[in-house]
């Protein structure tokens, strides 16, 4: 399976526990945090892991990829993200399909569960994932204001690769004061 670094860093998953149905995860490790000429991460969809946890069926303790600098386990520990493996993720997916989203926790063995599970829907997830200040990328004849509601880095890259000056603003920013040719409102949680 490819794409777990991108999925884990996708702001759209903020506050959620990600349950992956592909049977083997971790086999190619995690790439470096390098940035491109625009100051955008080359390998991730944002600056950090946004999920609150990861549930997988089988974890590969050995990884192999020319671009890997650490294991998935090391990366998740660095960012204090809990994970669990050895779980029938396809059965969980069936339950979610039939019943809709559910609250949940990943609890270390021997520890007690919290009496009340935090509901991430009570938090303003867009405020959590949005940039906190205006950020400019690239240069060009056309200027586009991007309202950041949880934008992925690949969307930023798509604009600047096409010669657009991109002005990324927080979700609650008064962009009407700016000079721009186009407006893009990103997706998010």
Q: In which residue ranges do the predicted regions lie?
A:
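N-terminal Rossmann-like NAD(P) cofactor-binding module of classical short-chain dehydrogenase/reductase
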Residues: 184
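RNA-binding accessory domains that recognize and position tRNA/RNA substrates
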Residues: 1-172, 178, 187
């Amino acid at each position: 399976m490819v794409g777990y670094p991108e999925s884990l860093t996708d702001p759209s998953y903020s506050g959620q526990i990600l349950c992956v149905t592909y049977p083997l995860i971790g086999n190619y490790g995690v790439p470096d945090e390098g940035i491109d000429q625009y100051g955008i991460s080359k390998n991730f969809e944002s600056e950090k892991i946004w999920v609150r946890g990861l549930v997988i069926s089988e974890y590969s303790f050995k990884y192999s990829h020319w671009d890997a600098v650490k294991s998935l386990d090391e990366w998740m520990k660095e960012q204090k993200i809990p994970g669990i493996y050895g779980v029938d993720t396809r059965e969980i997916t069936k339950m979610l399909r039939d019943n809709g989203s559910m609250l949940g926790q990943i609890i270390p063995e021997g520890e007690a569960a919290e009496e009340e599970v935090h509901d991430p829907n009570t938090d303003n997830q867009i405020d959590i994932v949005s940039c906190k200040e205006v950020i400019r990328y690239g240069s060009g004849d056309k200027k586009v204001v991007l309202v950041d509601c949880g934008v992925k880095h690949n969307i930023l890259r798509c604009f600047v690769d096409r010669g657009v000056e991109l002005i990324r603003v927080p979700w609650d920013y008064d962009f009407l004061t700016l000079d721009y040719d186009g407006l893009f409102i990103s997706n998010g949680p």
